[in-house]
């Protein structure tokens, strides 16, 4: 592995020669059952140690709060049921997904291509903190064409009114088409005004990119009126629902990417995402080979192991496993169909980059490390912050810019391009 693949000071020496954490074969069976309890192996200087532990303490509080919210949601759809309740799983439902991963690792068997004729409309949004001087800010929406792979969930999805309309925010220059950066928010973190700043979208826009913020299923305006919080619907249809909602997220994003290519003439698209969005963007790397780059930020790669760490929700999951006499491996197998570790990326490692937080306790760095090993130890940057407070964020934004520049992900005026070709 070239030394330059780790582009941050933290963990540079301690990780460079360390053995891979990614097991061979079926990862859901061969990954340590106690992966969620595995310590983080960082060697930190005193100043970094202080910052990491301070931010990690904040994450522990947020994790308890998030775990409490999920604990009120999980019993509805996660407790095993042998009835045909629309909001509970059955063994037959689980078999649908385990059969898929048993038969091979082709992601397109579950993530089926969306139709090409989905109509995307745009409108002027009522508000937005970033209004470009030279360009437009547009709201995008379209009817999600997603049909659940598990046919039993089709009536449930048809009953979702708000979630059936996919949405995004699009900042585009007057002159185009431009290289476009698509950003995907995290769980419960959908407000555009937050993500405009978090992803430094103005900075990327000023570099000549067009930028898009996509809204995940059951978040923001896609949340149903009955939801207590944004993102709740992602978990109210059981384990099957998580798989299908991730399937819908990928489907809607592929519609959006197709629209950018066909209708806007965009030929260079990079995708980044944080947390749940990092999980989603990592999956896209295994599905869309035409992407220029994928940059997951504090990604989740084994949601079952993550959930076991979020108390009290993790206790509910452990109780369910005990009642079924299952190990965590069985639960991993059910969600493996929507996990990036199950598939090989279609992009070469030179077009992949991971950003991980050393003090992150909501999506711990062991997840970023596992994906890094799975992706052949591509470029990675470690920052000394938690899930929300990304200390030294300016450093990894600069690394992202440098990474994209190396891929020639830039806008060149027509006259400049002619001169370059003539030279």
Feature locations, PLM:
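N-terminal targeting or regulatory segments adjacent to alpha/beta-hydrolase or S9 domains
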Residues: 1-153, 160, 207, 417-423
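Proline/glycine-enriched tight loop/beta-turn segments at coil->beta junctions
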Residues: 160-165, 172-180, 206
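Cap/lid segment of the alpha/beta-hydrolase catalytic domain
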Residues: 182-247
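Alpha/beta-hydrolase fold nucleophile elbow
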Residues: 263-275
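Hydrolase active-site cap/lid region
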Residues: 280-329, 382
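Short beta-strand/loop motif that positions the catalytic acidic residue
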Residues: 347-348, 353-356, 360
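Conserved alpha/beta-hydrolase "acid-adjacent" motif
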Residues: 361-367, 392
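Catalytic histidine-centered segment of alpha/beta-hydrolase-like enzymes
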Residues: 385-398
